């Protein structure tokens, strides 16, 4: 894996099964995904292709042996909705590689385009490599049931909850939170069953020092995206951006609440762009995912 190395192309079919399986995995059954809204094309969840973009490395590398790498950071941009029946072409490239605290990190970018060459989405992923089963150097995270005994993190929220974004939305406004109960089936379906990993196989997870299979960090990102899709509407799918870091584990049985607060409003041509702080936290109040997001209004 060297900087500049190209990845792909790979093709992804956006069919009924893919849309509905993803809806189950992230517990988001918006009618726009399940049946389509009257007079409109049926679409998929905004983050429907997030795992496909993350695994564009499969075009060059076979990592079906259970290697337990850790996903550290994720950026995602939305340009156009993903529509039922499309064939999306994925391409990517490695853009950075570095060592920090004796661990190798690699960053790669990937994008999806439709049959007409229109950009649908773009992702930038950073992962910590080289954690094969049985050789995890860092202490294993506490099991989910133990995490619930920790003192909650302080979350300062003072503004009103605003259902829908507009040019008059004030700074400090809260986005309506999204609450999810995570089950093992969702974790496995989200990741896919084509390989054993710390997300799908208990034996592999325990060999890597984990107490249970662990949810992909991307799942928390999809929950935040759901909240922001409800808040912004179509401008989230056509101009939304999110950048998050995955800072604590999520296990089956956890309850995850995803929230956002409007931090700033900036001019963007004839429109404004709302900048938000975003995060997901477990039932103990421990943040598991943190970052920023924005979209035009």
Segments and roles (model prediction):
Residues 73, 78-177, 246, 250-297:
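HotDog/MaoC-like acyl-thioester-processing domains
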Residues 1-73, 134-238:
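Hot-dog-fold acyl-thioester-processing enzymes
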Residues 212, 219-265, 281-283:
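Catalytic-pocket segment enriched in acidic/His residues
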């Amino acid at each position: 894996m060297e900087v500049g190395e190209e990845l792909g192309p790979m093709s992804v079919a956006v069919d009924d099964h893919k849309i509905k399986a993803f809806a189950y995995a992230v517990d988001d059954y918006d009618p726009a995904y399940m049946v389509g809204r009257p007079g409109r094309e049926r679409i998929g969840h905004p983050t429907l292709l997030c795992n496909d973009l993350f695994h564009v490395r499969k075009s060059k590398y076979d990592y079906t042996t259970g290697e337990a790498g850790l996903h550290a950071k994720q950026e995602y941009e939305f340009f156009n909705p993903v529509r039922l029946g499309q064939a999306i072409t994925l391409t990517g490239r490695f853009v950075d590689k570095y060592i920090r605290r004796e661990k190798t990190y690699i960053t790669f970018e990937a994008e999806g385009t439709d049959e007409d060459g229109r950009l649908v989405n773009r992702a930038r992923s950073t992962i910590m490599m080289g954690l094969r089963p049985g050789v995890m150097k860092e202490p294993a995270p506490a099991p989910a049931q133990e995490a619930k005994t920790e003192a909650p993190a302080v979350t300062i929220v003072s503004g009103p909850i605003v259902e829908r974004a507009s040019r008059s939305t004030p700074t400090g406004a809260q986005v309506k939170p999204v609450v999810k109960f995570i089950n093992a089936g969702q974790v496995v379906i989200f990741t896919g069953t084509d390989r054993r990993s710390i997300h799908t196989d208990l034996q592999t997870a325990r060999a890597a020092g984990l107490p249970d299979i662990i949810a992909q960090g991307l799942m928390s990102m999809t929950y935040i995206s759901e909240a922001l899709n409800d808040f912004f509407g179509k401008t989230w799918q056509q101009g939304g951006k999110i950048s998050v870091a995955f800072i604590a584990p999520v296990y089956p049985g956890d309850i995850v609440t995803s929230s956002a607060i409007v931090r700033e409003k900036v001019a963007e041509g004839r429109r404004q762009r709302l900048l938000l702080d975003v995060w997901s936290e477990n039932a103990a109040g421990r943040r598991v995912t943190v970052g920023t997001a924005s979209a035009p209004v």
